[in-house]
Amino acid sequence: MPGLTPPDRFCSATFRTFEPRSASQADALDAARRFVEAYRRVPSLTERVGRWLGWGPSRPEGLYLLGPAGTGKTHLLAAMYHALTPEVPCAFLHSSTLFRQTKPPDAFARQLAESYAVCCLDEVEIDDPANEMRLVQWMKTLSDEGVALLGTSNVDPERSLVTHVSGGRVHRFLQTAFRDRYRIVIVEGDDFRRTDAVERTGHVWVAPPARTRPLLERARAEGVEVFAD
């Protein structure tokens, strides 16, 4: 399945380029690094035998970055993707890609498992019980197939929609199995997008290209960061 990579604005996101502005962001950065280190670590013979017998440490199943918008969650998700690839095949997709699928969620998960060892799911926001149940089925199938999941969301899985409409397996998964399988890391802080916008000052030119081009070239020559649309 081609094209399952981070968006262009995060194509060069790394742990080094992430600048924590709060204690929880620093903790999230550390958790992301530790996940990559643990996943890439080559187990000893004893550990491999232990995994085969069902005891001893196993590879981490996933990491779930939870917090408000603009706190760097997607940057960290993309940084983990880049730190793992190409040695570890990873898929990166927005939650809307999952919900637009016409095939059953378990079939889509198995299709991903054929090519990828880690799946990065960005911006999990659920406003529909049907989509939430699709998400749970997809996640359970990925786990059963041995695919690790890295996710970002503004929504605590324990405060989900189906909590109020279902008392069955979906509810139990979100309340218990989710925390057993995935480490949840809180990422708090000011909205990067708003603080960066305040810190960046400059000029805006609105005119035909022939008139704005000389102004843009002059600004570039003066070392000003230029965005042209």
Task: Indicate residue ranges for each PLM-predicted region.
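A short, basic N-terminal segment
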Residues: M1-W55
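Walker A (P-loop) phosphate-binding loop of P-loop NTPases
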Residues: G70
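Conserved helicase/translocase motor-coupling segment
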Residues: E225-D229
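Conserved lysine of the Walker
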Residues: K73
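Hydrophobic positions on the alpha1 helix immediately C-terminal to the Walker A/P-loop
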Residues: L76, M80
